[in-house]
Amino acid sequence: MKETLSSKVPTTRTVGVTFDSVSESKSKLKSGSVQGTTATATATGPPSPPSSYVIKCLLKTARFMWQVTTIPAKIGDTLGTLYRYAQDSVDTFLCVAGKARRKERDGDQNSTDTKLYLEESVLERKLPEADLKALVDLPAGLDYNEWLASHTLALFEHVNLVYGTISEFCTQSGCADMTGPGNRTYLWFDEKGKKTRVAAPQYIDYVMTFTQKTVSDESIFPTKYANEFPGSFESIARKILRLQFHVIAHLYAAHFREIALLGLHTHLNLTFAHLTALHRRFNLIDEKETDVLRDLEVALRLTDDTSGQDSSSSVHEHSSSSSSPPVQHQQHQHQQQHNNSSSTSNSTSPAEALHVNSQSNSNSHSNSSNSHTTTASASASLIDGDSAAPPICTQPEAGAGCKPAGSSGLLGGILGDLTSGEFGDTTRYCTSAVPQAAASSSASAAGPGADGAASAALNNGAGALHLNFSNNNNNNHNLNHLNHHHHHHHHQHHHQHHPHGHHGHQGHQGHQGHHQAPASTTVPHSGLIQCNAAGAVGASAGGGGNAVSAATGGATSASSTA
């Protein structure tokens, strides 16, 4: 037994050694095969899938092209490889084309979703086109930089106010990019000129911060007597207006539904029309920037139309001499609208509302030298003022006052109702509350002193145009310089550094006591453009004929005066 055990021990040991060697060889073979497989997979396997779907398709095609170049062992393999290559080539073409078509469909769907502002129901109320041209025309004798600064400040305030109402809907997650209509994306350029992709709230905050800092700079927007505008002021104003246009484009593309539900779409349309008219008049923004909202310009009839020059002149009763250069137009209708308005009535409000084409003296209203002269280039675009086309703003019934937004849907002569606390008191804007027949009868009963009011009523409710530039930012520039100042530094401005970036502006009363008239007082309103034919009719019926603003106490009483 011992010998047997001793004789079997070497055998067992040998077997064990043999087993170990076999296991070692197997493990080596396995490891070698694994390594070979790994190397093969690394060499012949496809690369990591790219992020782009199109690149994946192209790489897939390149792989089969490599397979065709290899010499197969049999002719059948060659035919099979060629067939697979042809099939994959077709699939590659279809996948790229399908991806492009899918993007196009998605873009069309997004474009349709973001163009709610083109619906007829939200385009029916706005100021007449002719008044917008009169709003931006440079008055005779007024400095161009002063005029441009006033409009820049007004547009900055209006855009900031409208955005402030929906700022809670514009979030980092909901608006990850600063987008505009047509899948337009805006990138922010920092101080070093580096492009940065930021979210829409941050982009708009940058815009408002930059604008507020710029308009508060005394060296750029001078308010003191000894200071002058810098030579580069126009380029700075162009940049501010371009950035404000980006904000407007984002509001239309991403938040127009909320704005329409709040009843503020008319104010946004009016702000856009104001900016477009100013840009068209002085060519301030590149056409590539404004192309994204060109369809809205067409819907609002703000596009260039050479045939609209004659009709615009007929609406305004412009007298343009054929021998005089085409760059100057005498605006007689607005002169008639303010024939009986004195110089004190033009500056009674502490907010210094702009009476477009107002007279510097009530005793010289018949003198044509006091009418404002438009200075424009011969190639300047004219806003379509087709008198044959009916106004979009519908006229309410006689004796019916302005109703708040929502009481009559989108109908009526109201341009909007601002009820937010950020806008101060409730302020309503009406194009007209008196039909043409009633306005004509009241004007004829008032006598010849009401010619301006009658012409305003017959102009489809165009009325006397009022613009308040100095409610929320006392950094404004007096736009009645033609009547009261021959230099833009005769008055003091106080730059109230209010919170930028759509924080609610509180109305600061500026120019206190500068042009006070004990005869009439006007409470500052929200600062948006007012078309107030009813005020002119009511004043003419009373015998005064003053086309002053009827917005007293923060609300426009349009029909109570009729």
From Swiss-Prot:
This is MOB kinase activator-like 2. Residues 482-514 have a biased composition (Basic residues). One of its GO terms (biological process) is cell morphogenesis. One of its GO terms (cellular component) is cytoplasm. Signal peptide: none annotated. InterPro entries: MOB_kinase_act_fam, MOB_kinase_act_sf. GO terms for molecular function: metal ion binding. Its main location: cytoplasm. It is found in: Cytoplasm; Nucleus. Zn(2+) binds at residues 170, 175, 250, 255. Required for the normal morphogenesis of a variety of polarized outgrowths including epidermal hairs, bristles, arista laterals, and dendrites. Keywords: Cytoplasm, Metal-binding, Nucleus, Zinc. It comes from Drosophila pseudoobscura pseudoobscura. It comes from the Eukaryota. Residues 31-45, 305-349, 357-378, 471-481, 547-562 have a biased composition (Low complexity). Residues 30-50, 304-378, 468-523, 538-562 are annotated as: Disordered. Interacts with and activates trc, also interacts with wts. PANTHER family: MPS ONE BINDER KINASE ACTIVATOR-LIKE MOB (PTHR22599). Belongs to the MOB1/phocein family.
